[in-house]
């Protein structure tokens, strides 16, 4: 019975991969908060991000929430990654084991773009002011082994992005499953067989930047005399979707 369930689950996953890839390919280049695509943890990145089926530590908060159920003792992870052009990325997370309930995880990802010169059409070399930009994601995860060979996990996250005086925010959820099978197991035990992992990340609301930087005086009639140059105007920004990520992996 268990083998039938596992085989059926594998077939469903393969079908979903084909379907979701077809649905999300047209969103490339049209998303915001792309720092959510940067991997967490040296072990995962050294494996080329092929981690969804073997995630079993605090970094599972990012890769596959279901993997957090394999944490046996409360633990923490701190990571600092120097990125491109003086961009710094930091992750801090912890996993807390609650007997007979599951594992709870908390994680914070912060990306700092540093400071830059403020420029405009009149002062293209800089106005003398400086501005900064940063992205933050706070994640709450719950994971549990439903049975000995099947784990499920979900995350709720709050995403915030700030550029000088303008900011945007969104909410999202992550879902993940991890299945231990006895396929290709030389001992017949599930733990020695093939693992199947799947996760969907960043399914949530859209982000739209707003702030005092979007409010500027506009001259509605620059070729006519009169006090038209102090009319309050607002630059309306568009809404952008979060980068929806679908991962599936197999490990032996």
Question: Could you say what each language-model-derived stretch is?
Answer:
Residues 1-25:
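Bacterial Sec-dependent N-terminal signal peptides
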Residues 23-45, 81, 88-252:
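Outer-membrane beta-barrel porins/channels
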Residues 49-52, 74-83:
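Short strand-turn segments of transmembrane beta-barrel domains in outer membranes
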Residues 52, 68, 83-84, 183:
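Short polar/acidic secondary-structure junctions
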Residues 53-56, 128-130:
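Short, flexible loop segments at the rims of nucleotide/cofactor-binding pockets, characterized by
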Residues 56, 72, 87-88, 136:
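Short, basic and Ser/Thr-rich N-terminal targeting/leader segments
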Residues 59-70:
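N-terminal periplasmic accessory domains that precede
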């Amino acid at each position: 019975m268990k083998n039938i369930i596992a085989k059926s689950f594998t077939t469903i996953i393969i079908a979903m991969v084909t379907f979701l890839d077809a649905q999300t390919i047209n969103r490339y280049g049209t998303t915001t908060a792309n720092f959510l695509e940067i991997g967490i943890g040296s072990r995962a990145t050294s494996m080329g991000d092929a981690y969804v089926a073997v995630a079993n530590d605090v970094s599972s908060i990012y890769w596959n929430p279901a993997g957090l159920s394999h944490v046996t003792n409360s633990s923490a992870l701190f990571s600092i990654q120097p990125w491109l052009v003086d961009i710094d990325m930091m992750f801090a997370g912890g996993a807390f084991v609650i007997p007979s309930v599951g594992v709870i995880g908390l994680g914070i990802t912060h990306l700092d773009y540093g400071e830059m010169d403020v420029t405009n059409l009149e002062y293209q070399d800089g106005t003398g002011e400086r501005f900064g930009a940063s992205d933050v994601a706070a994640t709450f995860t719950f994971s549990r082994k439903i049975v000995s060979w099947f784990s499920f996990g979900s995350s709720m996250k709050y995403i915030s992005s700030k550029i000088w005086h303008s900011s945007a925010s969104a909410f999202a959820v992550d879902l993940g499953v991890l299945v231990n099978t006895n396929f290709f197991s030389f001992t017949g035990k599930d733990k020695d067989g093939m693992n199947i992992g799947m996760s969907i990340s960043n399914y949530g609301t859209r982000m739209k930047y707003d702030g005092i930087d979007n409010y500027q005086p506009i001259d509605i009639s620059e070729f006519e005399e009169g006090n038209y140059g102090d009319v309050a105007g607002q630059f309306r920004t568009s809404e952008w979707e979060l980068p929806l990520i679908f991962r599936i992996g197999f490990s032996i």
